[in-house]
């Protein structure tokens, strides 16, 4: 029996093999998220992959859209200007001003807007035909975005405390007994320098990875049952799996927006902690 053919718009590594070949259907896994497009050294670290290409495309699209929409501003906005103003006002007012505070938020709006739009566009690419890959499902990309947030966070906190040493001292609340201070300092250090960055990056990565894997399972599994199933029940199950994947796609779109919003919201929360006098 011939192998099941997976659409070229899906990950090519996720292939259902022929019965009696390599064991039948192979469930999509984490390995399907590594696909060297231009492997300079085989499949090494310097290979240009689909996530890298999609990320560059997203940056180009965002730059083209924002520059084009704001080149000729009018009192009555065009559709593109309306979308730009809407996204800016959403991030500025809902995230920046409401979370960081009206005194300090404006200087951080460009960072927050960049984070929100970049993450959102790259997440939505997960359901765009012929791309269908959420780049945030590659853990290195959320980690880089998190590092940017935390460089800003700690830089602002150190400036507010007028130095590195006063900043570290501020991690310990006043009035504690001497024996408790090293313990609490260790816990606070882990929280601000390890746990918070890890959870911020891994939350985005995990949701995008799990959501895309789920869609792959339903679509590729449905295709296998529909084409390779040897009875009507399996064929019907395959068709049902395809239908369910359509509903899952709309649900995934909601998750993609929420993850972009949550990442940006948490970044604003951490920055607000840095600018706070009580930090």
Predicted regions mapped to residue ranges:
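Selective transmembrane helix interface/packing segments
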Residues: 2-279
């Amino acid at each position: 029996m011939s192998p099941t053919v997976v659409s070229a718009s899906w990950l090519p590594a996720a292939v259902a093999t022929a019965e009696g070949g390599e064991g039948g259907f192979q469930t999509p896994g984490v390995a399907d998220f590594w696909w060297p497009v231009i492997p300079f050294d085989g499949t090494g670290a310097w290979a240009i992959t689909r996530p890298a290409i999609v990320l560059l495309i997203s940056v180009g699209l965002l730059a083209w859209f924002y520059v084009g929409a704001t080149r000729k501003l009018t009192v009555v906005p065009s559709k593109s200007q309306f979308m730009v103003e809407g996204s800016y006002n959403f991030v500025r007012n809902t995230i920046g001003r409401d979370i960081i505070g009206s005194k300090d938020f404006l200087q951080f709006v460009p960072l927050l807007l960049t984070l929100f739009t970049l993450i959102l566009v790259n997440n939505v690419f997960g359901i765009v035909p012929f791309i269908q890959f959420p780049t945030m499902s590659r853990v290195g990309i959320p980690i880089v975005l998190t590092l940017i947030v935390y460089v800003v966070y700690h830089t602002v906190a150190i400036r507010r405390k007028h130095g590195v040493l006063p900043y570290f001292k501020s991690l310990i609340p006043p009035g504690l007994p001497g024996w408790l201070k090293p313990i609490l300092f260790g816990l606070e250090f882990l929280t601000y320098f390890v746990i918070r960055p890890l959870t911020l990056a891994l939350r985005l990565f995990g949701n995008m990875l799990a959501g895309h894997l789920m869609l792959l399972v339903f679509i590729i599994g449905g295709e296998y049952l529909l084409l390779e199933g040897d009875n009507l029940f399996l064929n019907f199950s395959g068709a049902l799996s395809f239908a369910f994947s359509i509903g899952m796609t709309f649900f995934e779109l909601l998750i993609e927006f929420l993850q972009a919003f949550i990442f940006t919201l948490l970044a604003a929360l951490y920055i607000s902690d840095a600018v706070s006098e009580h930090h």
